[in-house]
Amino acid sequence: MSDWGFEKTLGVVTALPNVALTAPRNVGLAHATLAPKMTLLDRFRGKGGRRLCVEALAAQRLVSGNRELAEDLADRAEVLAVSAGQTLISQGAEDNDIYFILAGTFDVVVSGRRVAGRSAGDHVGEMAAVQPAQKRSATVTALEDAIVAKLSAEVFSNLGSRHPQLYRLIAQELARRVLQLESRSIE
């Protein structure tokens, strides 16, 4: 904005909620237009948002490029914004949703000790989704503003019936994480 040299005018205009001033470089204020301010969440909603959501879900380890599964997930998931510092999952909690991380990064903490980081392409909450009697084994907190696709355990189970490879991929991911934790404990 400072490239345009009229910060004070922009400050007044952008005081409107969810509105941004857009104009090409070297164009006077008379040619600037008001446009809705795009949020990270907006990228995954509305026009073009579903396509981007499907692409992000297809890139998930659990989806492994399966376009049909990615579309099923996009149809059934609730896409949510998570603010930096917000806790997504609390250790010991009894909820059992699974979250696919579409954007952003998270810390995974067990009993006050950071054990892992998770980012776009990863998922969290699968243990409680697969075993509903299982309480949450970790606290997952956003390190930056993030976007997740949330599925209830029931919906995830139904998708697992239609796409049985999900359970094989979860088993592979859990095995990878166990090996990762074991290698850290040896160091």
Where in this protein do the model-derived segments appear?
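Cytosolic regulatory regions built on CNB/CRP/Popeye-like sensor folds
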Residues: 1-187
